[in-house]
A protein has these predicted regions:
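Alpha/beta-hydrolase
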Residues: 109-279
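Substrate-binding/catalytic groove segments of enzymes
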Residues: 81-87, 119-120
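Active-site phosphate/pyrophosphate- and oxyanion-stabilizing loops and adjacent acidic/basic residues
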Residues: 25, 108-109
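Alpha/beta-hydrolase fold nucleophile elbow
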Residues: 85-102, 106
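Eukaryotic short linear interaction motifs
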Residues: 10-13, 43-46, 105-107, 119, ...
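Intrinsically disordered, low-complexity regulatory regions enriched in Ser/Pro/Gly/Thr
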Residues: 28-31, 89-91, 115
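Structural recognition of the beta-strand scaffold that forms the well-ordered cores
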Residues: 2-4, 34-38, 96-98, 120-124, ...
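N-terminal cap/lid subdomain of alpha/beta-hydrolase-fold enzymes
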Residues: 1-73, 77-82, 101
Length: 280
């Protein structure tokens, strides 16, 4: 049994891609296994009786990591399918749990806490360790980004870093305006520039990160009436997806309630502006 955990979201959108076109389906075919797309409690249709938008607030006491982990162990220990005589429970059939990000953390915890139920786990991008200055995160992105695109990104990042490290408020205002981010704090603006790299995390170098690199390195469409770093920054700001991605990353005002200190770390893509936050 190979279980894919949809994490903090409904499972339906994942079913087609996971079952018919994924490395997980390849594993299932290779080992003659069956697949399950698991939906986390309190997401999608996996809601307790009585919970609505208007009522049932007391039920949220059952939305805990421990109880959500126990759901998986209970399923593995008692699973059966009508019409199949084989024992599919974890006592007779190996259960492999697959997840990434939060669900990757769940995969690691399940193997540790329920070894009798989970035979093996595949934990991708699992945040099992808390670290303030996690510059290593960007290393795979740097090493897998074409040299020309990486050079352009470095130039823009260095320029923006220098602008926000100084006291030229006019330049900072101009940059925020170009990125449709005039209402954002300096910290939130820095966060918004991570948008293309979030795309790399989600889908690898394939589109739309590929589109970003091609857009940034298309010299025929770059204005030449200003300095190199300035015109490349303007080019980044005009990338069609930047505004919407920035809005997604900063849709919550919570990011502006954070007191931040910035560090320039000479590693990964460039001296990227790493923001170390201290919650009030």
């Amino acid at each position: 049994m190979i279980v894919f955990d949809s994490g903090e979201g409904q499972a339906d959108p994942y079913v087609g891609a996971i079952v018919y076109d994924s490395f997980i389906s390849e594993l299932a075919h290779q080992f003659h296994g069956a697949m399950i797309v698991f939906e986390h409690r309190f997401y999608g249709g996996s809601l307790p009786n009585g919970l609505t938008l208007e009522s049932g607030e007391d039920l949220y006491q059952y939305l805990t990591i421990e109880q959500a982990l126990a759901d998986v162990a209970a399923l593995a220990s008692n699973f059966s399918v009508k019409g199949i005589k084989s024992d599919l429970t974890s006592s007779a059939t190996p259960w492999v749990f697959v997840g990434s990000s939060y669900s990757g953390l769940r995969a690691a915890l399940l193997r540790e806490r329920y070894p009798h139920a989970i035979y093996a786990s595949m934990a991708g991008s699992a945040p099992v360790e808390t670290k303030v200055d996690f510059y290593e995160y960007f290393k795979p992105i740097a090493s897998n980004t074409p040299a020309k695109c990486r050079s352009v990104i470095e130039e823009v990042v260095n320029f923006v870093d220098a602008a926000f490290a100084g006291h030229n408020e006019t330049l900072k205002a101009e940059l925020k305006s170009e990125f449709s981010a005039s209402n954002l704090s300096d910290f939130a603006f820095g966060e918004s520039l991570q948008a293309p790299f979030q795309l790399f995390q989600n889908v690898g170098y394939a589109s739309p990160f590929t589109d970003f690199c091609e857009y940034m390195t298309n010299q025929s469409q770059i204005s030449w009436n200003m300095s190199s770093d300035r015109r490349l920054t303007e080019r980044w700001a005009s990338w069609p997806q930047q505004a919407s991605l920035s809005a997604e990353l900063t849709q919550s005002n919570a990011i502006d309630t954070i007191e931040a200190r910035s560090y320039l770390v000479s590693d990964g893509l460039a001296k990227f502006l790493f923001l170390v936050s201290i919650l009030h």
